[in-house]
């Protein structure tokens, strides 16, 4: 089963006129991984896509917050030293915030009910994550140690 099968499909997405709406999906990592890229997608009422991680030890981290613009259809690639490292059991949360009000300059008509659909005037959202899974916990832990050492070295060097 792919991670795409784990997230809600938002078939019940419904945004009332002149309002905002928030939808959230979660996925629990069944093995350690790192995120090397992400690509969000929403339509005209999309405002933000927020990707967060809740780690098994209870720590929380903001992975990315995309200030959405429908004309932006590109991927974000992480450099090696900042790729999020996710241990097994990490909960990934993707929050999508929609703005169907006059405050949204992309919104063609805030007086419309908005439903899930493929047309630009409908709404949808998905987030594609480029993930590399580790089959070996030791390899993952070694990368975590190397990253920690690199960060300590950068701090000591003043950067």
Predicted features and spans:
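His-enriched metal-coordination microenvironments in redox/metal-binding proteins
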Residues: 1-140, 147-159
């Amino acid at each position: 089963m792919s991670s795409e099968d784990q997230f809600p499909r938002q078939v019940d997405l419904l945004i009332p006129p002149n309002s905002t709406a928030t939808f959230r999906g979660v996925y629990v990592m069944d093995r350690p991984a790192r995120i090397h890229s992400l690509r969000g997608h929403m339509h005209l009422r999309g405002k933000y896509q927020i990707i967060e991680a809740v780690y098994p030890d209870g720590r929380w981290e903001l992975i990315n917050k995309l200030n959405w613009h429908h004309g932006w259809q590109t991927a974000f690639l992480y450099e090696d030293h900042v790729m999020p490292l996710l241990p097994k059991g990490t909960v990934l949360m993707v929050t999508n915030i929609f703005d169907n009000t006059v405050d949204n300059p992309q919104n063609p008509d805030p007086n419309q009910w908005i439903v899930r659909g493929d047309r630009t005037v409908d709404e949808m959202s998905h987030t594609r994550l480029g993930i590399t899974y580790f089959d070996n916990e030791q390899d993952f832990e070694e990368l975590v140690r190397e990253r920690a050492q690199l960060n300590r070295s950068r701090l000591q060097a003043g950067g």
